[in-house]
Amino acid sequence: MVSYYFVVHDMMAYFQHGDMICCKIRPETEPKHLKPKQQMFRKIRKGDKIVYYAAGSFVILGVFTVKSDMEYYSDEMWPSVFVRQIEPDLLPPKGKYLHIKKLLFESNYAFDVFPDKKLWHTALRGKTLKSITKADYDKFRRNLSESRFLVSENEIKIPVTSWQRSQGHNDAPVISSTGRISSW
């Protein structure tokens, strides 16, 4: 049975590893028994569906299918994390993103994951991912090309998140004309 998740990362993480999602490791675990900081990350399975949200930029980057089991991963961008490989199912039109605030406040949609639209951000605070209903997933998917909810890449901010600061990145990146991060 397919499960559905709302993954909270940031634009920088997506540009670094757009084919993966990650979760920090619990600091108190023994090396032989490493565990993800958010236990729900363990529950994700191959074939599950995710909505990829870029925190701080307020945009949905697309919907994806999980392609791998959880595995340990480490490189200079993502040192010592658990990852899962992902593959895009549907992305917004090139150079555009689905703006979550526009979708929430300029539509009549009700979302199970955000029972109180005014407090939508509190449902995500401190989360890497959150379980969502298929109905919510379908609403996000359906609106990835709905022009009234889209913003261009030039309209979004890419803040340096606490995760990125912890990795030694203190300057906000810029998206180049080729869609890559510049200034890093």
Where in the sequence are the language-model features?
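Compositionally biased, charged N-terminal/linker segments
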Residues: 1-46, 132-168, 179
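GIY-YIG nuclease signature motif recognition
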Residues: 7, 63-64
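Short, charged beta-turn/beta-strand-edge "cap" motif at the junction between a beta-strand
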Residues: 54-59
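Active-site metal-binding core of divalent-cation-utilizing nuclease and nuclease-like domains
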Residues: 170-184
